[in-house]
Design a protein with these regions (language model features):
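Conserved catalytic-core segment of nucleotide-activated headgroup transferases in glycan assembly
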Residues: 14-33, 145-208, 212-223
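A charged, aromatic-enriched C-terminal amphipathic alpha-helix characteristic of glycosyltransferases
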Residues: 22, 275, 286-317
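Short N-terminal targeting/anchoring amphipathic segment
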Residues: 52-69, 82, 123
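Active-site proximal beta-strand in glycosyltransferases
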Residues: 75-94
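Membrane-proximal helix-turn-helix segments that form the acceptor-binding/catalytic region
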Residues: 89-91, 102-124
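Donor nucleotide-sugar binding/catalytic pocket of nucleotide-sugar-dependent glycosyltransferases
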Residues: 115, 119-155
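Acidic donor-binding loop of glycosyltransferase active sites
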Residues: 223-237, 248-250
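Short hydrophobic beta-strand element within catalytic cores of glycosyltransferases
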Residues: 241-244, 251-255
């Protein structure tokens, strides 16, 4: 009888705190992939990782650039090492730094040190090809990264006869704050009775055209005929604000930045300015009720190397 292969996944505190987030979704999808290919998995946060790394593992997976300080320790305790930065360290850190988040300068230097001094890494994955290409400087002499997009996006879409404009996100996050300012400007080009529904923690009502719902579980977030708005201007990765509604067959309007990594789709509209956003909203509203929602699923991504990752996982005993 073959001995069970054991894997340890190390994620950020946000990814392991039990709340739904992009980081938690990423960790969950990698955990599912490991279990589906025959691994018994354990999960640790950065804070608890060292106690888990007192044992030996067949595979250790580190998710996020902020776990890079554990690469050397993980290498000593595992047969194989998988590093999933997820999105581009350069795009994410620099965009926050340019937003006057000064502490990002220190985090940037810290992560850079651990990246350049890291040991051999057997598999590197990113969430999109764009993110991978932005980090070519440090992985160029290592293994060629694979692209592992977002899974686990199935959501219940409840029936509704009426369209809603929807923005979801944490209001404490700077890119979301900028997006809300963008939408406040967008609302000036819309009919005065047309509201934008805001879903998420920490969102303040800054416009008479906004309706704030606070945090909602994903069972109550998605309705047929919703139009999801994602005016993101900075950062890396695939935007969940785009991925989740698009995966589930809903209309999305986003910027060139927010739509990066996704295929062209009749349900994904691109706009760069508040006026353009309002024009795209009006165009979708003129089309009327979209009827039964068709779910395109993996067809939304430009590239998804899950089959190659599965093959790699099955290649060692």
């Amino acid at each position: 009888m073959n001995k069970d292969r054991v894997a340890l996944i190390i994620g950020t505190d946000i990814a392991t705190n039990g709340f739904e987030s992009g980081a938690a979704l990423r960790l969950g999808s990698i955990k599912h992939l490991l279990e589906d290919t025959g691994f018994k998995t354990s999960v640790a946060s950065r804070k608890t990782a060292k106690s888990f790394l007192k044992s030996d593992w067949d595979l250790v997976v580190l998710i996020s650039f902020s776990t890079s300080s554990l690469l050397r320790h993980a290498r000593r305790r595992s047969k194989m090492l998988w590093f999933d930065p997820t999105d581009s360290w350069t795009l994410t850190r620099l965009s926050l730094l340019f937003s006057a988040d000064i502490k990002q300068a220190f985090i940037l230097i810290r992560d850079l040190f651990f990246l350049w001094t890291s040991p051999k890494i057997d598999l590197i994955t990113f969430i999109s090809e764009r993110d991978s290409n932005k980090e070519r400087l440090w992985w160029g002499k290592r293994s060629l990264p694979l692209i592992l997009s977002i899974d686990g996006l199935d959501r219940e879409v409840k029936p509704s006869k009426y369209p809603r404009l929807v923005f979801s996100g944490d209001g404490r996050y700077r890119p979301n704050q900028r997006a809300l300012k963008f939408l406040s400007k967008t609302s000036k080009f819309l009919p005065p009775d047309l509201q934008i529904h805001l879903i998420g923690r920490g969102i303040r009502n800054t416009s008479k055209n906004f309706k704030v719902h606070g945090y909602l579980s994903h069972q109550d977030m998605y309705f047929a005929n919703d139009i999801h708005l994602a005016p993101m201007k900075h950062g890396g990765g695939l935007k969940l604000k785009v991925a989740v509604p698009l995966w589930n067959g809903l209309h999305v309007i986003s910027t060139p930045e927010g739509s990066s990594g996704f295929k062209k789709s009749p349900r994904l509209k691109i706009a760069s300015t508040p006026r353009n956003f309002a024009e795209q909203i009006s165009e979708i509203l003129r089309e009327g009720n979209q009827g039964e929602v068709a779910k395109p699923r993996h067809e939304i991504y430009l590239r998804h190397d899950e089959a190659e990752v599965r093959l790699w996982l099955r290649s060692f005993a």
